[in-house]
C-alpha cells in the first residue's frame, strides 16, 4: 500500500446517475450536493460587455439560466456518451462550488448500472486515475448499495432512475449475476413520452430547456393508475400546471398515460419487458429455494419509483406473475431518491472497504484488469 495517510482520508462518494448526480463524503447521512447531470452551452450571441461569463454551465448555474442554454446530458441509459462533458461535470464536483477538495487526496466510490459495457467502466477508471489522480477507486453496482441503505442483506432491489431500470436479487449479501435483469426504459423515456402526449393535447415543448419543464410537469402531475383501462373510460380530471412564463397548461389523461410506459414499453414500440416483468423474471431466474424469500423482500430505489400509486400498481402486477400462495412484500424507503448514495456512504465508511478498492499503484501495474478483478 502506498502512503497510508491519503488513503486514510474520507472517501468521496459519487452516484453518477443518468439524470441527477449525487456527491458527498462517506459517512454523511445524505449527499452534500445533487444537481442534474447535464451541461449547458449558450445558444445566443453575447452583445453586451456585462453578459454572463463562461462557455459552459454546470449545476445550479445551468439550471438558473437554462433558457439561454442548449442542454446536453452526457449520459444516456446509464452509459456515458460524451466523455469530455462527463469529465467537466466531475471536475465541477470537486470545485470550490461543490466539495471544495482536491481529487488526489480522497479515494472515490463511483456507482454504475449493472450489465453496463465494460468499456464504460474502463474509461471511467482511466479518467479518475489519470486525469484526477485519485489514490484509490471502487466502482460499485447501484442496486447493491440501495440494499445497504436499508440495512438488509437479502432482497431484490428494483432500481428505476432516469436512464436505466434494473432488478438485482441479493441473498445474504451475495448478488446473483445470472439473475440480474435490466431494461433501458426509465424516467427520461417517460418524460419524452409525456412531451409527445402534451403535444397532442396542444402544448409544444421543443427546446432542450423546455424538455426540463416537461420533466418538472412529470414529477409534479403524473401518477400511475391501478387500472388504466378503467381510467381511460372515465373523464380524467385535468390538473392545471403553471409554466415558467406564467401561462397555465391543463394536463389531462397524459398524467397517467406517460408513466404507463414503465409497465408497457410497447406504447412507444419498444420490445423490452415492463418493470413488473423485470422484477418477476429476476426472481424466477434465481434458485427455487430463494424465491419465496425474495418475493417478500422487494426494495424500491430510484426516482422513477416515486410516482404516486407506483407501489400499489407494482404489487397488483407482480401478484399476477407470482405463484398463488406467495406473500409479496414491497418496501419503499422514503429516501429512495438517494438510497444508492446513502448505501455508498455506508460501504465507503466500513473498514472492510479498504480491501475492496483498486489503488493507483495496482492500476498502474495491471491497468483495466485491476478494475474488472475487483468489480463484479
From Swiss-Prot:
One GO location term (cellular component): cytoplasm
Keyword Disulfide bond on entry: no
Modified residues (N-acetylmethionine): 1
Cellular localization per UniProt: Cytoplasm, Cytoskeleton; Cytoplasm, Cytoskeleton, Microtubule organizing center, Centrosome
Source taxon at top rank: Eukaryota
InterPro entries xref list: Actin, Actin/actin-like_CS, Actin_CS, ATPase_NBD
Keyword Nucleotide-binding: yes
Keywords of this entry: Acetylation, ATP-binding, Cytoplasm, Cytoskeleton, Nitration, Nucleotide-binding
Residue positions, PTM 3'-nitrotyrosine: 4
A molecular function (GO) term: ATP binding
A matching Pfam family: Actin
Family: Belongs to the actin family. ARP1 subfamily.
Function: Component of a multi-subunit complex involved in microtubule based vesicle motility. It is associated with the centrosome.
Name the record gives this protein: Beta-centractin
Organism whose genome encodes this protein: Mus musculus (Mouse)
Amino acid at each position: 500500500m502506498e502512503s497510508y495517510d491519503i488513503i486514510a482520508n474520507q472517501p468521496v462518494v459519487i452516484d453518477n446517475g443518468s439524470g441527477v448526480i449525487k456527491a458527498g463524503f462517506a459517512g454523511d447521512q445524505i449527499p452534500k450536493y445533487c444537481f442534474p447531470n447535464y451541461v449547458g452551452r449558450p445558444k445566443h450571441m453575447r452583445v453586451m460587455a456585462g453578459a454572463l461569463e463562461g462557455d459552459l454551465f454546470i449545476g445550479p448555474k445551468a439550471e438558473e439560466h437554462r433558457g439561454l442554454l442548449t442542454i446536453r446530458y452526457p449520459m444516456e441509459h446509464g452509459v456515458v456518451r460524451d466523455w469530455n462533458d462527463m469529465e467537466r461535470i466531475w471536475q465541477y464536483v470537486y470545485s470550490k462550488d461543490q466539495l471544495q477538495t482536491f481529487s488526489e487526496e480522497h479515494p472515490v466510490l463511483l456507482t454504475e448500472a449493472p450489465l453496463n459495457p465494460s468499456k464504460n467502466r474502463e474509461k471511467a477508471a482511466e479518467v479518475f486515475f489519470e486525469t484526477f489522480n485519485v489514490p484509490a477507486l471502487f466502482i460499485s453496482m447501484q442496486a447493491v448499495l440501495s440494499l445497504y441503505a436499508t440495512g438488509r442483506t437479502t432482497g431484490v432491489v428494483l432500481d428505476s432512475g432516469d436512464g436505466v431500470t434494473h432488478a438485482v436479487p441479493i441473498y445474504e449479501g451475495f448478488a446473483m449475476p445470472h439473475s440480474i435483469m435490466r431494461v433501458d426504459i426509465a424516467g427520461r423515456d417517460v418524460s419524452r413520452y409525456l412531451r409527445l402526449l402534451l403535444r397532442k393535447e396542444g402544448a409544444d415543448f421543443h427546446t432542450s430547456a423546455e424538455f426540463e419543464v416537461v420533466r418538472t410537469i412529470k414529477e409534479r402531475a403524473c401518477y400511475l393508475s391501478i387500472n388504466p383501462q378503467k381510467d381511460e373510460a372515465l373523464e380524467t380530471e385535468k390538473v392545471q400546471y403553471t409554466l415558467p412564463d406564467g401561462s397555465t397548461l391543463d394536463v389531462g389523461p397524459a398524467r397517467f398515460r406517460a408513466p404507463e410506459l414503465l409497465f408497457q414499453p410497447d406504447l412507444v414500440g419498444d420490445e423490452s419487458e415492463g418493470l413488473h416483468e423485470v422484477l418477476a423474471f429476476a426472481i424466477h431466474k434465481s434458485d427455487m429455494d430463494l424465491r419465496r424469500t425474495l418475493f417478500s423482500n422487494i426494495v424500491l430505489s430510484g426516482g422513477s419509483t416515486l410516482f404516486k400509486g407506483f407501489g400499489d400498481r407494482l404489487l397488483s402486477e407482480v401478484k399476477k406473475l407470482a405463484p398463488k400462495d406467495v406473500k409479496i412484500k414491497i418496501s419503499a424507503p422514503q429516501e429512495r431518491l438517494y438510497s444508492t448514495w446513502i448505501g455508498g456512504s455506508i460501504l465507503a465508511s466500513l473498514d472492510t472497504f479498504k480491501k475492496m478498492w483498486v489503488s493507483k499503484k495496482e492500476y498502474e501495474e495491471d491497468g483495466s484488469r485491476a478494475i474488472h478483478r475487483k468489480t463484479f
